[in-house]
From Swiss-Prot:
Gene Ontology molecular functions: aspartic-type endopeptidase activity; ATP binding; DNA binding; DNA-directed DNA polymerase activity; RNA binding; RNA-directed DNA polymerase activity; RNA-DNA hybrid ribonuclease activity; zinc ion binding
Compositional bias segments (type: Low complexity): 1-16, 153-165, 402-418, 960-969
Domain RNase H Ty1/copia-type span(s) in chain numbering: 1610-1752
Protein name in UniProt: Transposon Ty1-LR3 Gag-Pol polyprotein
Residues annotated for Mg(2+) 2 binding in this entry: D1346, D1427, D1428
Domain Reverse transcriptase Ty1/copia-type stretches: 1338-1476
Pfam families for the chain: rve (PF00665), RVT_2 (PF07727), TYA (PF01021)
Gene behind the chain: TY1B-LR3
Catalytic activity: DNA(n) + a 2'-deoxyribonucleoside 5'-triphosphate = DNA(n+1) + diphosphate; Endonucleolytic cleavage to 5'-phosphomonoester
Motif Bipartite nuclear localization signal boundaries: 1178-1212
């Protein structure tokens, strides 16, 4: 606030700094309120004079030194005064500054804040000043002096004078925070004084000087209310006003009382902040003054630590003491005692040089009594000239100790020389020194941090080569020596000021001189024994004397601690003064800032940048000349070396020496590229390249993996090739440090062949530039060739090889020759070269019959390496062949997507002619899985299967190359490749992926599994939309629904688009639970509970026999018993049997896992793969129809193309690998293509109905103005990426109607033609179930609507073209779209935005935050699923009003108005619902299952009996490898996909009791053993036997005042592979089950408690999201509950113990769980295991237990 005021009055550049100090804390920018009238007058006078003499400092100039820190100013220029309220702050006509504002005297001054008391606070610099505080305070305020410009009168004239002065009074500022009240009340009191109301201000005793009048009281009350809003008043002020809202006087009295009590502390802080010392007064007096202030503040609770105190002291040092700011600035642990020792040392040096008399010392008697303790010290520190302190010296090496990098500081010298004895002396304490009476004075200036130093003595150092001394007045003949380099024992530089002579006068009257160096930066004065030996003086440590070689004793040696010392009494003082010796070096080192200090201060910038900044004045306060730059050039900062470490620089042309040193093919570079993902199993995933150093000749070899034997085979091949073809021997191979090169196998091979491996250094890819650049070039060429040709990605290595052949023949600009010429090879004959992807016709030398066509369309790849032929790709046969029997198609563009095969689809004669090929393609190419593996005589690509993604359009994902039949792609499920996640789960072995699961025929020895569920990118994918994140829900239905309308969703398909459950993962489950929860009584549990918040009650009821549930958390406002009964009253918990059943349930739960191996597999499955209700695939397989499968097989067999038929090979399938590879579940294709519905449909009646539907669809498209009918565009004129292929799909709905839909091929849509950020949302299934549950409880009417051709109401922004419908016969023309056509990527998002905008703007709805497609207003709730709308309202007329509004814009059909009071049947998004308003609701799928299950060809009721449970406990899947024929394997996988797809769809709709078994079997889709198939059949059989079961809901009691949302949680510990645990949750709203989830824990839990904690933590986020939805849809209060059968989990939730957990993952979840439970009004209760219905989600259960837990809610 104050900083803003200052900026608004920037024209005032000077003023007094003020501060306000409350009890125990320091505030900024205000002074303590001086309540003394006399003091106020004096301060205002001084302030007026000071302000009249101030001058403005230019902003660009350096900040001047604080005048209070310098020598006294002349009398004519008094220093600035700091009164409590400066003159410019008074409210006069000439000065408009409001009272209470503060200004600083210098731009560099900073306010003193409480943060400066922190030991982590560092002031900006030595010159930064604190505000100047008033020097005194007095009695309470009264009228100011006349000089202030305002004359106050007594009470008799107050009213009359108020009128004349009000016009000059400026009101106080507004109070904006309770923390600002102490400062604000001062300005308010000042406002009253300026308003002639100073007499009514209370004094110290709380009474005003005069009686306040009623008008004054009214004025006081009104102004206080105006300028101090009630919301910003402190609590104690509000308490006073709550008693009497007019008692402003009491507030003022209490405020003044607080201020008065703080004045002494404020004065101490002000004094401490403005300390000044330049040596003019004794150092002891200065020390006493400072220590008294610190002691007084410490006693009052304001703790000034050593660091802050030292900073404040150093700020006030000037003159000779100023350099202590810099030498001491880096000492983090410096104490006040140490700093004063330095000050004493300088002071005594000054006194010794100026007065030539002994140093100033205090009397010994005073020293003993002058003991003070400082803050933050562990024991008392004696601050005295002769401190009485015990010796605690430590052994140290006698080396120079650099104080600039340590905590030691120098002590002063004692120059008194007296006679002493030469007896050997051993001192245990420095105070026991006895060298005669004179020697007692040598114990001076003990340094607090150098307990092992003997003051007044020189330390004898045998390791020092030079003598160093700190005292300047002992040096004779001093001279500057900046070139001397001295280091301490730690190799740190010691700055040297000067060099001179040290003269000794020993007791035999002999004089000796040695060289000495002067520096203040050492801890001891060191006397070098080496230099003494040079003048014939040695130290005898047996007699402890210094003596000459002739035995003459010169001086005694004193042993103190571990060191030996000699007294300074033998040193002769010099005549040079201290200032002179300090200036010998012209202050180049000691008085200048050392460069390392500046380097660190300025963020480790380099010297050049710092010098340039100082020259240009971008850094102020000091200049370039103030820095010692002598060490800048050679200075090496270790922090910079670590933090700015870079790689070494590579010299350009450094490889020339290798080219000159080696012959061709002697030095090779090699590197591996890969892997390339999403490829068929037979396509290579890597390639390895070799480059010769001299000739630059390149080789490339394909690799399927990076195993040692694969790499070794390649090395063997190329070495043999070079040896035989070029008669050369490879000497050196350079490679990186990848494991494929550094393994022992390859190393031994190279060693055996005499080849030297040359490895790059770590993380130095530039050193491997030759191989790296080649790979980059080849990849660039590969991408370009594939883009230009439109060939599928699995031919990527053919493009690599083509590029290698060409580039080996291209000349290098440097050498003017090609690599082939350097190698002595012939050049490339371009007449034999074809463009990559050139269309050709290959002769079929073995046709099926004599009348069969002899030509097969193909695409040229590259010249053959093994013959004179060409490698040609045949898409119709899914193979590459090496042949010379081909003809180039003249005039044909070399792009696959340019071929128009649509005409073939509708020409019956042509179709009949190529019927065998159509069958072949239909069964083998268009289907999802890679069915065929056709061989040829080609070496490495003969077995490449056609990727399900066909040759593509420019950057498209897939397109049929022949299209002789309409593509079978079900674009509703299409997803772009960029959205496909092919990464394995975390716990999956990274070496196992979709691309290497099934080996090719040549790699059959490696157990792998075929990539059955291929997408357009060659792999499987899952949708990354979490179930428990409705706020970010992005259901794929809307985006993929473009391919078909609502009618197809309501067909018999149960794909992803119907269920809205692509985001619901199915995790592996199974096994048994191994919980070992200790038996703890309820009373013991209660004792462990600590009351953490008001919402947790630590005293649960002891008895709860009704449900045996122990309450854990209840609000204090509701009784525990009522809350418990309220939450569990309507839950469908099982009733206990009359007699306790066998302990099977509990004992089963306690059983340990049967198989403890890491790869164990129970019914819970393997891995963390998520199974979904659908897969968004590029193409639809004809295998969905059993008839089509048989026809396709017959066609294949009757063709009898022996040269093309793949051999039937056995596949070895391993359970672990198969389970890890599971990504999703394949849906059943229920739609028909054009040729199936019309062209080849033999059912005449059905054909006619489809034709009728066809024309109806076309008419609707024309009616909706879907495309521009005025103009048709030529295909060649349009950018290919804006052209979208189209197709017709047909379907028969459940009600018997036939539907046709014309859709665009969005699966091959270019990314540039749509906004990838747009989302097409649909209602979440939980939102629908929640809305249905609330409708039942509140007697809502449910109305079902359908909007015809919904997508066509949304305009399209992009420029897109499609092919016209086939009946128009314009296959070479295009039409431009105007509407969001079905199948386009953006259609779903465009429709969502369109309908959302209309509902909000025209219907008055609003979307519920976090729940897309749920709209509401005060009467109606709408759930939107693309073009389906479900309306809920208590008033049917409200629904009708919405319908009327919708019909104005859209063709809206009322499927079911829901007005009947009897039972109404709905078919809502696949759910068959029976609803009788106010009574019940039943949700099932009996009709749908009755129709769909028989079509699965599963033998139903083989033994004529019904199953009672979907699975049996204790049954574990056999883990033996599965050996099966490839065709049989694919059939079984396809069958598993259909069966599990249907089961998953039903389970996530309403059969939550089956989720565990569904998830388990979903993990084994790629492991279709007999056992797995039998379990799947058993699940389908159980679904068939219980197809009439329904999810039953009953209306909630009308008396219930709250909505109750409950989650029941359970976990099965460690029953999954890799010791993962299975967790399950069931969610209930008002006793009705609305959802469930079963999944595997993402973390490996080490105990039952961890597993339960994980389960609970997974349930809470969705519970909170559902709570928000319920509160938005229904305004009744909501109670959230969570039930678990783990007492230990409950204990952790309630505990306040925050000690470290066993591991950080578990600890994080547990701490977060505590916060969520305590912060979300969540009630947690214990539930018995036998009543925990979530148990069915975590493990297989016995029949009796399964029925007991499910018969209450589904029957």
């Amino acid at each position: 606030m104050e900083s803003q005021q200052l900026s608004q009055h920037s024209h005032i550049s000077h003023g007094s700094a003020c501060a306000s100090v409350t009890s125990k804390e320091v505030h900024t920018n205000q002074d303590p309120l001086d309540v003394s009238a006399s003091k106020t007058e004096e301060c205002e006078k001084a302030s007026t004079k000071a302000n009249s003499q101030q001058t403005t400092t230019p902003a660009s100039s350096a900040v001047p030194e604080n005048p209070h820190h310098a020598s006294p100013q002349p009398a004519s220029v008094p220093p600035p005064q700091n009164g409590p309220y400066p003159q410019q702050c008074m409210m006069t006509q000439n000065q408009a500054n409001p009272s209470g504002w503060s200004f600083y005297g210098h731009p560099s001054m900073i306010p003193y804040t409480p943060y400066q008391m922190s030991p982590m606070y560092f002031p900006p610099g030595p010159q930064s000043q604190f505000p100047q505080y008033p020097s005194s305070v007095g009695t309470p305020l009264s009228t100011p002096s006349p000089e202030s410009g305002n004359t106050f009168t007594d009470s008799s004239s107050a009213d009359s004078d108020m009128t004349s002065t009000k016009k000059y009074v400026r009101p106080p500022p507004m109070l904006t925070s309770p923390n600002d009240f102490p400062n604000w009340v001062k300005t308010y009191i000042k406002f009253l004084q300026n308003s002639n109301l100073g007499g009514i201000i209370p004094t110290v005793n709380g009474k005003p000087v005069r009686q306040i009048t009623d008008d004054e009281l009214t004025f006081l009350y009104n102004t206080f209310q105006i300028f101090a809003p009630s919301q910003f008043l402190p609590t104690w002020v509000k308490d006073i006003l709550s008693v009497d809202y007019t008692d402003i006087m009491k507030i003022l009295s209490k405020s003044i009382e607080k201020m008065q009590s703080d004045t002494q502390e404020a004065n101490d802080i002000v004094t401490l902040a403005n300390l000044q010392y330049n040596g003019s007064t004794p150092a002891d007096a200065f020390e006493t003054k400072v220590t008294n202030i610190i002691d007084r503040l410490n006693n009052n609770g304001i703790h000034i630590n050593n660091k802050v105190a030292c900073q404040l002291i150093m700020r006030g040092l000037s003159g000779e003491y100023k350099f202590l700011r810099y030498t001491r600035h880096r000492h983090l642990n410096m104490t006040v005692a140490e700093l004063f020792l330095d000050i004493h040392a300088i002071y005594e040096e000054q006194q010794g040089s100026r007065n030539s008399k002994p140093n100033y010392r205090r009397n010994l008697s005073d020293e003993k009594n002058d003991s003070r303790s400082y803050t933050n010290t562990t024991k008392p520190k004696v601050i005295a000239r002769n401190p009485q302190k015990t010796n605690n010296s430590k052994s140290k090496t006698a080396r120079a100790h650099n104080v600039s990098t340590s905590n030691n500081s120098p002590s002063t010298d004692n120059d008194s020389i007296s006679k002493s004895t030469t007896e050997p002396i051993q001192l245990n304490n420095k105070h026991d020194l006895h060298l005669g009476q004179e020697l007692t004075e040598s114990t001076v200036n003990h340094t607090n941090h150098s307990d092992d130093e003997l003051p007044g003595h020189l330390l004898l150092d045998s390791g020092a080569s030079r003598t160093l001394i700190r005292s300047a007045h002992h040096i004779h003949s001093a001279s500057s020596n900046p070139d001397i380099n001295v280091v301490d024992a730690q190799k740190r530089n010691i700055p040297i000021n000067a060099i001179g002579d040290l003269q000794f006068h020993f007791q035999d009257n002999t004089k000796t001189s040695i060289k000495v160096l002067h520096t203040p930066n050492i801890a001891y004065d060191l006397l070098s024994l080496n230099e003494l030996a040079a003048v014939d003086i040695t130290a005898c440590f047996t007699k402890n004397v210094l003596e000459r070689s002739d035995g003459t004793v010169l001086a005694p040696i004193v042993q103190y601690g571990d060191f030996y010392w000699v007294s300074k009494r033998y040193l002769l003082p010099s005549n040079i003064s201290v200032p002179t010796i300090n200036n010998v070096h012209t202050s180049e080192s000691t008085r200048k800032y050392p460069y390392p200090f500046i380097h660190r201060m300025l963020a480790h910038a380099n010297a050049q940048t710092i010098r340039y900044s100082l020259k240009n004045n971008t850094i102020t306060y000091f200049n370039e000349s103030d820095v010692d730059w002598s060490s800048a050039i050679d200075y090496q900062c270790p922090d910079c070396l670590i933090g700015k470490s870079t790689k070494h620089r590579h010299i350009k042309g450094s490889r020339l020496k290798y080219q000159n040193s080696y012959e061709p093919f002697q030095y090779l570079h090699t590197d591996i590229f890969g892997p390339v993902h999403n490829l068929p199993k037979s396509a290579p995933s890597y390639f390895i390249s070799f480059t010769d150093e001299t000739t630059k000749f390149r080789w490339v070899y394909p690799l399927h993996d990076r195993r040692e034997d694969s790499i070794l085979d390649v090395f063997t091949t190329i070495l043999a090739f070079i040896k035989n073809q070029f008669q050369a021997s490879v000497l050196v191979i350079q490679m990186d440090r990848g494991s494929e090169y550094t393994n022992r196998t390859l190393h031994k091979f190279l060693e055996k062949n005499g080849i030297t491996p040359c490895y790059t250094t770590t993380a130095d890819s530039r050193a491997h530039g030759v191989a790296e650049r080649l790979n980059r070039t080849l990849l660039d060429d590969c991408r370009t060739q594939l883009q230009c040709s439109g060939l599928p990605n699995h031919l990527w290595f053919s493009a690599i090889e083509f590029s290698t052949i060409v580039r080996n023949s291209l000349a290098s600009p440097k050498s003017k020759k090609s690599a082939s010429q350097h190698a002595g090879l012939a050049g490339l004959d371009i007449s034999t070269l074809l463009p990559f992807g050139q269309p050709v016709i290959v002769n079929d030398h073995n046709p099926n019959s004599k009348i069969h066509p002899r030509g097969i369309p193909g695409y040229a790849l590259h010249p053959s390496r093994n013959s004179y032929g060409y490698i040609i790709y045949l898409p119709s046969l899914k193979k590459t062949v090496d042949t010379t029997n081909y003809v180039i198609l003249q005039g044909k563009e070399s792009r696959l997507d340019q071929f128009n095969y649509d005409a073939l689809t509708f020409d019956e004669d042509l179709n009949r002619l190529t019927a065998s090929y159509h069958s072949f393609i239909a069964s083998n190419e268009i289907q999802e899985s890679n069915d065929l593996n056709i061989e040829s005589d080609h070496d490495f690509q003969s077995d490449i299967e056609l990727h399900p993604e066909q040759p593509r359009n420019v950057l498209s994902k897939a397109v049929s190359p022949t299209d002789s039949t309409p593509p079978s792609t079900h674009t509703e499920d299409s997803k772009p490749i960029s959205e496909i996640n092919l990464r394995a789960p975390r716990e999956v072995d990274p070496n196992i992926s979709e691309s290497n699961i099934l080996p090719s025929k040549k790699r059959s020895s490696t157990p792998q599994i075929s990539n059955i569920e291929s997408t357009g990118s060659g792999g499987m994918h899952k949708l990354n939309v979490p179930l428990l994140a409705p706020m970010s829900q992005s259901n794929t239905h809307e985006s993929s629904h473009a391919s078909k309308s609502k009618d197809f969703r309501h067909s018999d398909s149960y794909s992803n688009n119907e269920t809205n459950h692509t985001n619901v993962p199915i995790s592996s489950t199974g096994g048994t639970n191994n919980k070992t929860v200790p038996q703890i009584s309820d009373q013991e549990t209660e004792k462990r509970i600590i009351h953490r918040s008001p919402s947790i009650d630590a005293s649960p009821p002891e008895n709860n026999s009704s449900h045996n549930i122990v309450p854990i958390k209840t609000p204090t406002t509701v009784s525990e018993q009522n809350t418990e009964e309220s939450i569990i009253a309507d839950l469908p918990l099982p009733d206990p049997p009359p007699e306790p059943p066998t302990e099977l349930s509990d004992s089963f739960k306690e059983l340990p896992p049967i198989n403890s191996r890491q790869t164990n597999s129970s019914l819970g499955g393997i891995g963390d793969s998520n199974a979904y209700t659908t897969i968004n695939s590029k193409k639809r397989s004809l295998e969905d129809n059993e008839t089509e499968i048989k026809v396709s097989r017959d066609t294949w067999n009757t063709k009898n193309m022996r040269s093309l038929e793949p051999p039937r090979s056995k596949k070895r399938i391993h359970l672990i690998a198969a389970a890890k590879a599971v990504k999703s579940i394949k849906p059943i294709r229920t739609t028909l293509r054009y040729d199936e519905a019309i062209t080849y449909n033999k059912d005449i009646k059905e054909k006619e109905k489809y034709i009728e539907a066809y024309h109806k669809e076309v008419n609707q498209l024309l009616k909706m103005n879907t495309w521009d009918t005025d103009k048709y565009y030529d295909r060649k004129e349009i950018d290919p990426k804006r052209v979208i292929n189209s197709m017709f799909i047909f379907n028969k709905k459940r009600d018997g109607t036939h539907k046709a839909r014309f859709v665009a091929r969005g699966d091959i849509q270019h990314p540039d033609t749509y906004d990838t950020g747009m989302q097409s949302n649909t209602v979440h299934h939980y939102a629908l179930m929640t809305s249905l549950s609330l409708a039942l409880d509140n007697n809502y009417y449910i109305t079902q609507l359908d909007i015809s051709s919904a997508y066509l109401y949304a305009d399209i922004k992009e420029e897109l073209y499609i092919r016209p419908p086939p009946h128009l016969g314009m296959n070479d023309k295009l039409i431009r779209l105007k509407k969001s056509h079905y199948g386009l990527k953006q259609s779903g998002a465009n429709w969502y935005e369109t309908i959302k905008s209309y509902l909000i703007k025209q219907c008055g709805m609003e979307e519920v935050r976090g729940w897309s497609c749920v709209f509401k207003n005060s009467q109606v709730t709408i759930c939107l699923f693309v073009d389906d709308m479900i309306l809920f309202s208590k008033d049917l007329n409200a629904n009708k009003k919405i319908i009327t509004t919708l019909k104005k814009q859209y063709d809206t059909k009322i499927i079911n108005l829901g007005e009947s009071d009897n039972e109404i049947q709905y078919d809502i998004l696949g759910l068959e619902i029976k609803y009788q308003r106010g009574k019940y609701m039943k949700l099932g799928m009996e009709n749908s299952l009755t129709e769909k299950i028989p079509k699965l060809n599963v033998p139903l009721n083989p033994k004529g009996r019904k199953l009672s449970a979907p699975g049996q406990p204790g049954l574990y899947i056999d883990q033996d490898e599965l050996e099966i024929d490839e065709d049989e394997y694919k059939e079984k996988v396809h069958e598993m996909q259909k069966l599990i797809g249907l089961a998953s769809y039903v389970g996530y709709k309403f059969r939550f009791d089956l989720l565990y078994y569904i998830n388990t079997l979903a993990q084994h889709i790629l492991f279709p053993s007999r056992q797995v198939l039998d379990m799947t059949y058993e699940l389908i059989q159980f679904m068939w036997d219980t197809r009439d079961k329904q999810l039953i809901w009953h209306k909630n009691k009308p008396t219930e005042p709250d909505n109750k949302l409950v989650a029941i949680s359970d976990a099965s510990y460690g029953n999954q592979p890799y010791y993962k645990s299975q967790i399950g949750n069931i969610f209930l709203l008002n006793g009705k089950v609305i959802g469930g989830k079963s999944t595997k824990a993402s973390l490996t839990c080490t105990s039952t408690t961890e597993a339960e904690i994980h389960a609970v933590s997974e349930a809470i986020p969705l519970l909170n999201n559902l709570s928000h939805l319920v509160q938005e849809l229904n305004k009744k209060p909501i109670i959230k509950g969570l039930l678990t059968d783990s007492r230990s989990t409950i204990s952790i939730i309630k505990s306040t113990n925050e000690e470290k957990f066993r591991n950080r993952f578990f600890g994080t979840k547990a701490m977060r769980l505590r916060d969520e439970v305590s912060g979300n009004n969540l009630y947690v209760y214990y539930i018995e295991t036998k009543k925990n219905i979530a148990d069915v989600m975590t493990k297989p259960l016995p029949i009796k237990t399964f029925k007991l837990l499910t018969n209450k809610w589904i029957h």
